[in-house]
């Protein structure tokens, strides 16, 4: 069923999205955008995911699925080639780590500048939890500085001062998942625009992302808090909300390290979080599963 959040987004981009036949067939069958509670069918995407599941993810990068995707994007006016897919493999990178009392915080590493943006905002809030405006300014300033001149996280965070803010940034979203043993994932992702280019690669069900060369990339914000001494998890946060994504993450982090709760983050930021004040594994009853009601998201959890 179509969620309220998806229905609102579909209504806001109905014109551009229905201009693409493949996208219109999915999101606006009969020429009318799907509404809340409507039935969303994505058979082509289901086939693509089934192929990845049965053949392996390598098929996306170097196999038949990669060739199919390259041909489909060409038909939609996209520039993706098989060579692009082959060279675009995911990679591991050391996190940006900061101490918070007895805990450690892992922020996203550069070039995902939402990590330094969140770290800068948290640095302000750690000294004054009420200084939201100053934290937001610090968040945007450090990200703008990185985009203008590059540099490493330590240098960027130590420079301080003010800098011009960021232009209006595109949409992103986030999710967090935690198991009862404290294994955690915090993920922030984007199509560089709401519904990306608004085009679906024919036969694949895959929405094509907008090029970061055309639009400024969003701030991708996520963080995980753990205690190394007791080998335990404390919190996982995902932030979104265009320019306020970094502040959203930092605001929840500050609450996790003080009250252990989660109040709404400053607009237009949104956050999804799992906070276990007494850590995992060990005290599952201390965990809160929270999503911002303004984002029409979903949060659920149990101790079994």
Residue ranges of predicted features:
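Cofactor-pocket helix-loop regions in the catalytic cores of large enzyme subunits
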Residues: 34-41, 48, 52, 161-178
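Low-complexity, Gly/Ser/Thr/Pro-rich intrinsically disordered linker/tail segments
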Residues: 279-304
């Amino acid at each position: 069923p179509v969620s309220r959040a998806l229905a609102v987004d579909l209504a806001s981009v109905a014109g551009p999205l229905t201009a693409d036949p493949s996208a219109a067939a999915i999101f606006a069958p009969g020429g009318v955008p799907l509404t809340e509670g409507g039935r969303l069918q994505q058979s082509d995407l289901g086939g693509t995911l089934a192929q990845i599941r049965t053949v392996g993810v390598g098929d996306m990068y170097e196999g038949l699925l990669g060739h199919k995707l390259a041909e489909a994007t060409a038909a939609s006016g996209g520039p993706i080639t098989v060579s692009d897919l082959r060279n675009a493999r995911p990679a591991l990178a050391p996190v940006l780590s900061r101490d918070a009392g007895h805990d450690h915080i892992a922020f996203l590493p550069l070039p995902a500048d939402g990590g330094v943006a969140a770290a800068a905002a948290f640095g302000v809030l750690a000294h004054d939890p009420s200084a939201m405006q100053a934290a937001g300014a610090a968040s945007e300033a450090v990200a703008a500085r990185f985009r203008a001149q590059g540099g490493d996280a330590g240098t960027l965070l130590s420079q301080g001062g003010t800098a011009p803010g960021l232009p209006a940034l595109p949409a992103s979203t986030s999710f967090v998942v935690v198991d009862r043993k404290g294994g955690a994932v915090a993920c922030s992702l984007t199509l560089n625009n709401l519904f990306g280019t608004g085009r679906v690669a024919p036969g694949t069900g895959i929405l094509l992302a907008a090029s970061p060369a055309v639009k400024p990339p969003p701030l991708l914000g996520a963080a995980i808090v753990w205690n190394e001494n007791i080998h335990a998890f404390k919190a996982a946060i995902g932030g979104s909300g265009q320019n306020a994504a970094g502040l959203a993450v930092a605001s929840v982090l500050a609450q996790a390290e003080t009250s252990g709760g989660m109040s709404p983050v400053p607009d237009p930021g949104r956050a999804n979080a799992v906070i276990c004040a007494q850590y995992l594994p060990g005290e599952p009853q201390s965990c809160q599963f929270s999503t911002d009601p303004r984002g029409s998201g979903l949060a659920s959890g149990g101790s079994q």
